């Protein structure tokens, strides 16, 4: 369901589609594609479970006056956690949470290795991984969920497809913009935002753009904007068949020179 409503444009679009009999076709992923998505989702959910468990262990330590943050899960930190003198039920909770953590870690590592193996089989995934901040998980998810770049005429359509553009409810001469539409894959949106933040830390140009947006708007808005920028950049890298270093020769969205999003 389209979440951008503007009466005149919608009317023109419907009229053109009826006149040309050119309604868009629906792309359906194949069985292998759908099964590999299960691999991505399975790992994602297990990582979320692990994060919740680690947060609970942090809370247990803080209740005893210890604030170790990430150090809690190093070998010395864990040893200190296990030495804490706790009440009976708190002690049992600590033990069972640590047991769950010990079971999750090797499973997540196994799934991560499987994702990396699948990524190495696909040249287009390896090409996307040349972009700063983009690892095997993000690149493979992007390729599986987008399917084929030829489905889209320009990079701007990618932002719409992944649900990272504002909702719009406009009529007459009034334009009303809301939150992002959140259409498409929530997993891909999450990965794009995470990868964009990694790119901000590694790439000076991305850091400059993010800082500018964060100062003008808000950090959360800037993060989504950089995630959308990354989605468009990856689209053009994939469609045109070049790596990150070559993409720097083009515009800010790595499309065609001088055309903004790459579309004429």
Regions found by a protein language model. Give the residues of each.
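Short alpha-helix plus adjacent loop in nuclease-associated cores
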Residues: 1-25, 34, 38, 77-83, ...
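Short, amphipathic alpha-helical segments that act as regulatory/interfacial helices
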Residues: 15-19, 40-43, 47-50, 54, ...
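Glycine-rich, often acidic, oxyanion-interacting loops/wings at catalytic, nucleic-acid
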Residues: 40-127, 253-254
